[in-house]
Amino acid sequence: MCRIFNIVFLMVFTLPMFGQDKAELMAQVLQTAKDYRDIAPVMGIIKQNGQVFKYVPSISPLMERYRISDYFGYRIHPINKTKQFHSGVDLAVTYAATVHATADGKIILAGNMAGYGKTVVIRHKYGFKTQYSHLTYIYCTVGQEVGKGCVIGFAGSTGISTGNHLHYEIVKNNKKINPLNFMLWNSETN
């Protein structure tokens, strides 16, 4: 329930919604969502109040099966063995698995990034940016507009990496936030 509350709070109070008082909408959503399994009805209520979901990272960047190999937050770095903040999630996946844009946006970086190897960064509306790193191949160019679900690259192990995976980050108003809170939405609820 806490995760749903965080997502709903972000959606209702920081994104422009239309036609309904925000406090009333929040009450309706929280009454509908009894626990985390009730995300589909919650998304339905919010979707009725604006076309924001195209621009909010709300699907997994990988459609193939993956394993979360490292979480958002402090961790012991797997290579230099020091405690460091990990600003995204690492999703272990097969080599060259397709990587998808998690929201509509514009490519602002498509190239090498120190430590991250081949990386794509997308700027979305409402202060969101997403980063996709350690790619084996980039399938987009700077300045290109992409839609939610479009293929932007293929997973790999470039940069400082211990194996094939995707490092995925979400930034909201220049603050890195936990991507798992957004990845729980699936394509049927968007």
Model regions: which residues?
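A residue-level detector for short acidic-glycine micro-motifs
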Residues: 70, 93, 109, 134-137, ...
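A structural signal for short beta-strand/turn segments enriched in small hydrophobics and glycine
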Residues: 99, 105-107, 143-155
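Zn2+-dependent peptidoglycan hydrolase active-site motif and core
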Residues: 84-86, 101-139
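Short coil/loop residues immediately preceding or within conserved phosphate-binding loops
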Residues: 63, 86-88, 96, 102, ...
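Short glycine/threonine/proline-enriched tight-turn/helix- or strand-capping micro-motif at secondary-structure
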Residues: 46-53, 69-100
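Short hydrophobic beta/alpha edge segments that flank linear recognition/processing sites
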Residues: 91, 119-122, 147-161
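Polar/charged, compositionally biased leader and regulatory segments
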Residues: 2-6, 15-75
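Acidic, glycine-rich catalytic/binding loops that coordinate metals and/or anionic ligands
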Residues: 21-27, 31-34, 141-142, 148-150, ...
